[in-house]
Amino acid sequence: MFSIVLALSLVTQNPVAHHIAEGDSAGLMHPDVQLHHYQAALAIDSTSYEANWKAARAISDVAKQILSNADSLKRRRDSLYAVGRVYAERAIRADSTKPDGHYVLSMVLGRLSRTKGSKERVKYAKIIFDEATKAVEIDSTYHLAHHVLGAWHAEVKRLSGFQRFFAKTLFGGGFMDKANWNDAVMHLQTAVRLAPDHIYHRLELAEVYVDLGKYSKAREQLQAIAALPVADVQDPKNKEDAAALYKDIEKEKDEK
């Protein structure tokens, strides 16, 4: 009885912390439940650093599940990412010395950019790079930010000549020239080393190895994925994608 009274007292004293804790306990397999609690915390204190960055992550995890190209669903997905950007920017305003706000802004815009055409994707490139870099500068072990940076290098290297010309016109000649395959591999390898059970780290690294013709290394990552437990709402789809990619490259020989 005393423990129940104590718990109710703590909730009354700090309802923001209570909602954040409830969101955390829902886990990454239930981002919709997480988002409900983080938004409840923000309804009480819209400046909460923790509630804002976690709400940005959760709403992005809800949005990433919308894979349809139907116009109404694309608008829904983009609107969720737009709200996620607001949350991430509020988190940075609340405390720019911590890495999470910088990471979630880079992540939200990175995911949004992958749903857009080439010109719009290029427009987000500098913010994504700068914010992920800040997160890693603050915490060099932030594996999720390393993933964003690795993906950034790979995505820029995959741009066509025209797209890179547009990027240079927008940002100046030097910025997009930062992108290189070595850093794509290095950051994604770092992400895998720091979080070896993270399925999407390994999948993205495998895709980069395929780009580079390093099929044996890609297969190593894809085989590892098959044995990993599901931890994220998108992991079942990631596992399917990994299995399909493995089948596609199963007999490929490494390029010299």
Language model features by range: what are they?
Residues F2-L10:
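Sec-dependent N-terminal signal peptides
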Residues N182-A224:
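Glycine/small-residue-rich hydrophobic helix-like segments
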Residues P15, F162-G172, P196-I199, R219-Q221, ...:
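Terminal, low-structured helical/coil segments at or just beyond the last alpha-helical repeat
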Residues H18, E22-H37, A58-T97, L105-T141, ...:
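Short coil/linker segments at helix-helix boundaries
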Residues S9-A21, E255:
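Cleaved targeting-peptide boundary
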